[in-house]
Amino acid sequence: MGSAEARLTLASTSPQRRAILEQLAIPFEVVPPDYVEDDPPDADAVELVRRHAEGKAHSVHIEGRITLGVDTTVLLDGRIYGKAADREHAGRILRELSGRTHTVVSGVCLLGGSTDVLEHATTGVTFRALAPEVIDAYLQSREWEGRAGAYAIQGLGGRLVEGLDGDYLNVVGLPGALLVSILERSAPKLLQIPR
């Protein structure tokens, strides 16, 4: 594969991950992963996101291609917060995150580069103390649907945040700094700036 044809296969249907790759000018194609996430109740968040990222990448990987799998979750007091099942569940999650600092953890798996890589990134996110009417208004927006931790920092969910410690893009859904570091080591041709 020549550098003009170099393209990453993204094992994800996430519009946020696509937008981040576009922002970073990394050429890619999307292939929805054929992977079922199983979340044991006693799972370690880092092990979980790494396993899911690897499973997603392997589910679509074709020899000779470079494939990226990513998984993101939210962690507070040792408890994993995935996507809310419904509005009531989303409200419960937001009340628990209110006024506290939680951790966003993403696993990143790259297959098919000079070496296969499986790493993770963490970002601390502090929510301001949320009044019930703020939570209700956010729930009405439905932006929480399909989001780890029941919020989207890049949208209205940014209003809920007081501070950030780490990579903002990780909270959106793909740790950009970690991805660039991995690509520099394993697939630098994907980082060539288009002319």
Question: What positions do the PLM features span?
Answer:
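N-terminal beta1-alpha1 ligand-phosphate binding loop
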Residues: 2-25
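Anionic-ligand binding patches
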Residues: 2-9, 42-195
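Cofactor-binding loop segments of dinucleotide-utilizing enzymes, especially the Rossmann-like FAD-
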Residues: 13, 33, 113
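Short, glycine/serine-rich, charged loops/turns that create anion-binding
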Residues: 15, 35, 176
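Residue-level marker of intrinsically disordered, low-complexity segments enriched
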Residues: 18, 28-29, 102, 191
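Short glycine-rich, Thr/Ser-proximal phosphate-binding strand/loop in the N-terminal lobe
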Residues: 25-42, 116-122
